[in-house]
Amino acid sequence: ETDDLWASLEYISKKPVRRIMNTWTKQVGYPLVSINIKKNKFQLSQERFLYLKKSDKTLWNIPIAVHSNKKIKYYEMSKKTIETEKFDYINESQVGFYRVRYDDELLKNVISIINKKNALDRLGIENNVYALSRGSYTRLDNFFELLPSYKNEIDYTVFLDISSNLSQIKFFFPDMKEIDSFVINLFSNIYKKIGWDSQKNHKEILLRSVVLTTLGLSNNEKVLEEAKKRFDICIKTKELDPDLKLAVYTMIAYSGNKEQYGQLKNLYIESNLQEEKIRLLTSMGKFRQKEIIIEFLDFILSDNVRYQDVTIAISSVANNYYGLDLTWNFFKENYKEFERRFGHGHSMPNIIKSICSRFSSLEKLGEVKKFFISNNPKNARCAIQQSLEAIKINYNFVKNNEKTLNEWLKTHQNIFK
């Protein structure tokens, strides 16, 4: 039994394994550890991390390792609050299963040592601050204060997470054009380093695609021009580096028109490779013109697209600010067809979440609720509930950060200089 395992581990390690593990295996969720300065000591407090805050008294026994001047001190945090000596950093290499929130003053200290940390910690710090802003534990401008420290970043995994988070921010704040300039500045060094020419290093290949796509979707003119140049050559000669295809196709759709849509669609129809078809479906969801988006949505339900690929295509359009409402309307208008095709499998819940979880207004919250009261797919109840919760999280995220982020962006345009 489990208790026997804990007892054996406890006997060998001489550590209170059973006492600690019971709080992790017999209750749901995971903790947030907040750190504040109190007099001449640090105060650590724990609470359950929730994107939608509610009263919750859950406590964990958390093994805490704090680092200061190359020394490590260990604590077992079983109470709501404990005090420790001052330290530089907590949760080295992200070995602890908890999020960390530093107060504003301590966060500045962490920012000053980021470049000395390993990739796991650089990722953990960045991911924590963004997650905390999503859950309204901190302001989103703290995330933007942090990011210039990553200007010389080279790790693929770190950049992938930064890119994903910035993409989500741009989706929720589409009118803040200063974000594009911020992203271009943040990614400028890595772009100079890796450019367009392929190196057969797996991580660099992956990194290049992320960097180019992020810059292109942030309206970097030079990157978009180079993508157009390479795509035109591809149309004439069928030659394009496979490692660059998704990035180039995505940028062509984002900056393209009806002509480019026709070219991408023809490539899709003519291709016999499923991998290529997936790339093209994903990229065609990035057009911004209403008439093209509507045409592509119709194409998705045509005989040209396999049933199992519909979710990928729908998700791509729904993840496009210009396509979300159109995708939702299309889903409602064609609900019977979606239910006929996907009503008994896993695709229907995925389609519902890919669309509805991206809304961020109370109006849409009510609209989604009303629609699924009348149309209740049997296997998607959990997906509907998750989507409604996501809308509430998104609403709070936008409401709590729209004004402060806009002000921060306007007053920090020279932050990279």
Language-model-derived ranges and their functions:
Residues 1-49:
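Gly/Pro-rich turn-and-neighbor structural signature
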Residues 7, 36-38, 43-45, 52-56, ...:
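Long, ordered, helix-rich scaffold segments
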